[in-house]
């Protein structure tokens, strides 16, 4: 394994069955940034008991775009759970956006929510409260400890499948069924 495992930006992390942290059990995490300082991602398969309509009302942003009111808000991770993050396609230009690549961005500024509420743009969004973060070397160590599987991200899984199907779909990209994974793992 290389010093940085390879850059995992725009990859999925699939929690292994031995994951001890309850925040990540059976989670699928999209990595928006990974570099020598650490990593930042959002869990994309954990809807919480809140809809976009409720969130928009809570932050006093009108939600006029059709079809969005009933969409769930997600638990994005255990860091800054009082703050919203929007994974969206296309990346666009917003006040506070981490541009992952030409196709996708992660934004934490209010202007994107105002645009979503008024026009439904950008057309593909996943809104979370909180994010997942790792310090320098932490994610690499967790991967070495067999806490995670990694696979290049497929945004069709995030934006095109119901949350309960996303983990299995990501695992199918690796040719693996979650039920066949062991809770103990080793290195050959």
Swiss-Prot record:
One Pfam family this sequence matches: DUF179
Top-rank lineage group of the source organism: Bacteria
One cellular-component annotation, GO: cytosol
Gene3D superfamilies according to UniProt: VC0467-like
Family of this protein: Belongs to the UPF0301 (AlgH) family.
The name this protein goes by in its record: UPF0301 protein AZOSEA09490
Taxonomic placement: Bacteria, Pseudomonadati, Pseudomonadota, Betaproteobacteria, Rhodocyclales
């Amino acid at each position: 394994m290389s010093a940085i495992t390879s850059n995992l930006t725009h990859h999925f992390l699939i929690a292994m069955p031995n994951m001890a942290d309850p925040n990540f059990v059976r989670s699928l995490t999209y990595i928006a940034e990974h570099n020598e300082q650490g990593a930042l991602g959002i869990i994309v398969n954990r809807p919480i008991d809140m809809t976009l309509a409720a969130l928009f009302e809570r932050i006093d942003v009108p939600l006029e775009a059709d079809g969005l009111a009933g969409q769930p808000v997600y638990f994005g991770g255990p860091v800054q759970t009082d703050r919203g993050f929007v994974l969206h396609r296309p990346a666009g230009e917003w006040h506070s956006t981490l541009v992952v690549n030409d196709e996708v961005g992660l934004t934490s500024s209010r202007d994107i929510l105002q645009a979503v509420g008024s026009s439904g743009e950008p057309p593909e969004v996943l809104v979370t409260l909180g994010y997942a973060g790792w310090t320098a070397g932490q994610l690499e160590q967790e991967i070495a400890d067999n806490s995670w599987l990694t696979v290049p991200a497929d945004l069709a899984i995030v934006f095109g499948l119901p949350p309960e199907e996303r983990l299995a779909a990501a695992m199918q990209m690796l040719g693996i069924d979650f039920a066949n994974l062991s809770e103990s793992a080793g290195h050959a």
